[in-house]
Amino acid sequence: MKTIGILTSGGDAPGMNAAIRAVVRTGIYYGLKVKGIMRGFAGLVEDEVIDLGLSSVGDIIQKGGTILRTARCEEFKQKEVRKKAYETLQKHGIEGLVVIGGDGSFRGAQLLSEEWNVNTICIPGTIDNDIPCTDYTIGFDTACNTVIDAINKIRDTATSHERANIIEVMGRNSGYIALYAGVAGGAEMIILPEVEWSIDELCDKITYGIKRGKLHHIIVLAEGVMSAPELAKMIKERLPKLDLRYTILGHIQRGGAPTVMDRVLASQMGARAVELLLENKTKRVISIRNNQIVDDDIDEALSMKKEFNRKLYELSKILSI
């Protein structure tokens, strides 16, 4: 193997640049040429390929986003479009492809491997932490820290005004950001897609807190359950005198300098991706489990089910009495 390529696909996540840096530097260390594909699979189809060298990845480990840009490519579901992507790889002599992204990105890599025998290695990069085969995805820790910073600031003003605040966080159909940030932020209530909840129980908890002199109430809401305005309306219908505000954090959770954890995780995964290609392995997804970097067959990785951390959720209920 002489030349490898790398792309980032789907939603961006802090730490992607650290992974790109690791792939490029490890590849060069082992004597490989490294090509960058701009804008994910869309750029692969459109032949947007650049050379990546040591200077290309200098001064990027601390930056959020991705220097390769990213885009969603619905057209990639069509076989004739995927053929164009394969032709781009052939044109540039790319013998191995590293794909950083979520499960949709992995499925794109899976199809390239199955249809055109492309050597592919996948790295989980998504703030949602919803990839079943790995304990943590690149970007999750940074996103949680961003949410924590917001919770801390919102609590300051909520306490001053004796208010309740709903904070809506990202995660699609996964409640991991809400759960981890909610526990770390001392939220009074965490509402997740994975757990049944009751609006009456929530309102009773707020009422009890007010009676015992509590100055604020922080409710962390995962976007996959409902929107913050919808929840606010439900609460106000039952507690019309409650001073209630809501904040939708939105895409601020995707940006910012990656944390130490995300930089180290991305560096480990990026280096391992190159090593796997040099070992002639393909269709692998790199993960971290029990603090060890491991890899799984992509078919198995996509069929796994993410285990919800119910113990942590139960702990959140104990700590929020």
UniProtKB/Swiss-Prot annotation:
Chain residues that bind substrate = T126, I127, D128, R163, M170, G171, R172, E223, R245, H251, I252, Q253, R254
Entry annotated with the keyword Nucleotide-binding: yes
Report residues binding ATP.
Answer: G11, R72, C73, G102, D103, G104, S105
Q: What class of enzyme is it?
A: transferase
Keyword Isomerase present in the record's keywords: the answer is no
Binding positions for ADP per the UniProt entry: R21, A22, V23, V24, R25, R155, G186, A187, E188, R212, K214, L215, H216
Q: Which residues cross the membrane?
A: none
- Gene3D superfamilies this protein is in? 3.40.50.450, Phosphofructokinase domain (3.40.50.460)
Q: Where is the active site?
A: D128 (proton acceptor)
A Pfam family reported for this protein in Swiss-Prot or TrEMBL? PFK
Q: Which cysteines are joined by disulfide bonds?
A: none
How is the activity of this protein regulated? Allosterically activated by ADP and other diphosphonucleosides, and allosterically inhibited by phosphoenolpyruvate.
Name the major location.
cytoplasm
Q: How does it assemble?
A: Homotetramer.
Identification of the protein by name = ATP-dependent 6-phosphofructokinase
Q: Which organism is it from?
A: Caldanaerobacter subterraneus subsp. tengcongensis (strain DSM 15242 / JCM 11007 / NBRC 100824 / MB4) (Thermoanaerobacter tengcongensis)
Task: Please spell out the taxonomic lineage of the organism that makes this protein.
Answer: Bacteria, Bacillati, Bacillota, Clostridia, Thermoanaerobacterales
